[in-house]
């Protein structure tokens, strides 16, 4: 199979990369009706599989789960997830032939094998759904011409898909139709109904493409979403311990600080996050973030280049074929880092203290968000896609670190994201350790500026504020957050 993106000419590549349109709520007036009375079979029952299925069932759709016979016989977790929630569970051979829509929600690594197994069982004219387009775009999966192929990609972990639905809302969602596979012209009807069934239409759906979703998703998760959190945690912990800060405090500041700091992003972008700092701390964080951007821009651009060219995917798939030897080795190395093993502490840290003593963390977040956004948009990905795959998802990933440190982050994210995270962090960590961290002290990570006067130069502060607020990620972020707020008010009646 050939990389699908690389078979396109330049004009087609740019067209597919640039697909992203925020859809009006009026486009979903029929909600999930198009799929009512049709049989939906989900393959795989992990976090996304189970929670999307629960939402669709609650939306009045007919949902069942097809699992490998061995998973059923051995009553594996996927079987328990579906069975204990009252779903019909059957083998591929039993359920796939009657399905109108087969949704593949297995891990990326399994997609080729799963699709090659289920495709011969699918009836003529059925539809095949994905929540991540890696198999189509990077592996170049050859799909039957009679199949309609669509994507619905919620921009958050599966557990949040369910929780937001239960609140009467949903999560922002990218939807797409594979241009090579829409023989009956019903792809968008199917995708919109599926998205509505999960509740995504209440938070806002973006009309995207398989290509735009894959390339932006890979870039975001490798760099700011996962790689930067991992590298930043490791080097910041090392700095604090070397300078005499108590290990329990240092670890807790990082583990819970990323979540607290990025929560500010969710409400008001980089501008609001920076506004949580005192004026001297804001100026310091800005200066540090500018240094970080200069230092790390080549690394961000390299990752974007390798994603666009397909080099990243081919490298990772070679590791798949080698029994994940690199992935498993990097996972073990991460588990042995000092940050992952810091002693538990009952020290209390107030919300504001995370900002005051985590100035460097704020700087890393600003630098990482802007670098990822800039690398994506410079490659033809439009602002909306770049925003969702950088700033928007960061608080969700930071929440996983808060739960069980880097281990939890790497367990929750996809196998593809985990591999890319290690590729980035394995270069970023020594780069920061050697070229950046020697010049910083615990006034920006661990202890704060203390009794420093709040006095700043007015002209300098104005310059800093304008630079922060005038970055393109802030403009598109304000627009998209206002859309989501408007939709939430409509959805919950308030």
From Swiss-Prot:
Q: Which reaction equation describes what this protein catalyses?
A: (2R)-2,3-dihydroxy-3-methylbutanoate + NADP(+) = (2S)-2-acetolactate + NADPH + H(+); (2R,3R)-2,3-dihydroxy-3-methylpentanoate + NADP(+) = (S)-2-ethyl-2-hydroxy-3-oxobutanoate + NADPH + H(+)
Kindly tell me the pathway this chain contributes to.
Amino-acid biosynthesis; L-isoleucine biosynthesis; L-isoleucine from 2-oxobutanoate: step 2/4; Amino-acid biosynthesis; L-valine biosynthesis; L-valine from pyruvate: step 2/4
Pfam families documented for this protein? KARI_C, KARI_N
Domain of life assignment: Bacteria
E.C. numbers: 1.1.1.86
- Kindly list the positions annotated as binding Mg(2+) 2: 217, 389, 393
Asked if Oxidoreductase is a keyword of the record, the answer is yes
Q: Where is the KARI C-terminal knotted domain?
A: 209-344, 345-487
The cofactor(s) it depends on are:
Mg(2+)
- Give the keywords, sorted: Amino-acid biosynthesis, Branched-chain amino acid biosynthesis, Magnesium, Metal-binding, NADP, Oxidoreductase, Repeat
The record's GO molecular-function terms, alphabetically, read:
ketol-acid reductoisomerase activity; magnesium ion binding
UniProt-annotated binding residues for Mg(2+) 1 = 217, 221
Q: What residues sit in the active site?
A: 132
Binding positions for substrate per the UniProt entry: 414
Q: Which InterPro entries match?
A: 6-PGluconate_DH-like_C_sf, 6PGD_dom2, KARI, KARI_C, KARI_N, NAD(P)-bd_dom_sf
List, alphabetically, the GO terms of the cellular component aspect.
cytosol
Relay the cofactor remark from the entry.
Binds 2 magnesium ions per subunit.
Q: What does this protein do?
A: Involved in the biosynthesis of branched-chain amino acids (BCAA). Catalyzes an alkyl-migration followed by a ketol-acid reduction of (S)-2-acetolactate (S2AL) to yield (R)-2,3-dihydroxy-isovalerate. In the isomerase reaction, S2AL is rearranged via a Mg-dependent methyl migration to produce 3-hydroxy-3-methyl-2-ketobutyrate (HMKB). In the reductase reaction, this 2-ketoacid undergoes a metal-dependent reduction by NADPH to yield (R)-2,3-dihydroxy-isovalerate.
Protein family according to the UniProt entry: Belongs to the ketol-acid reductoisomerase family.
Q: What is this protein called?
A: Ketol-acid reductoisomerase (NADP(+))
Native source organism of the sequence = Vibrio atlanticus (strain LGP32) (Vibrio splendidus (strain Mel32))
